[in-house]
Amino acid sequence: MKAGRYEYRWADGTTMVSAPEYVELLMNWIETQIDNEHIFPKKTGEPFPPNFEDFVKRILRKLFRVYAHIYHSHFPKIVTLNEQAHLNTCFHRYLLFVSEFQLVDKEEMVPIQKLVETILKP
């Protein structure tokens, strides 16, 4: 999957997959992570693992890559469908969350850095 000149490979960093395959693999992987009670405890009061933040960061980093791909490769089609307000609103809220809690490194945001800066501008 690509976002401009940036290429995202699956899992081990060597497996190149198409964007639809990447998204499907990602959604399945995220579901597996969320269903794992060792990572996301289901019972109230159960402690989260010490590396919980690492799991969350990894999930959100990979989701950012999907946004980057959509903006680079599909935004004109999104505009044609008159769906840009919905996409922009979802991305804006995502960015506010990951920025507030520093969950995605700035280096990861480079493929759509100008858009990120514009959206986060006070």
UniProtKB/Swiss-Prot annotation:
Primary subcellular site in the record, as a coarse category: nucleus
Keyword Cytoplasm among record annotations: yes
Superkingdom of origin: Eukaryota
GO MF, one annotated term: metal ion binding
Cross-referenced InterPro entries: MOB_kinase_act_fam, MOB_kinase_act_sf
Subcellular location: Nucleus; Cytoplasm, Cytoskeleton, Phragmoplast
Chain residues that bind Zn(2+): 69, 74
Keyword annotations of the record: Cytoplasm, Cytoskeleton, Metal-binding, Nucleus, Zinc
A GO term from the CC aspect: nucleus
Family: Belongs to the MOB1/phocein family.
Name recorded for this polypeptide: Putative MOB kinase activator-like 2B
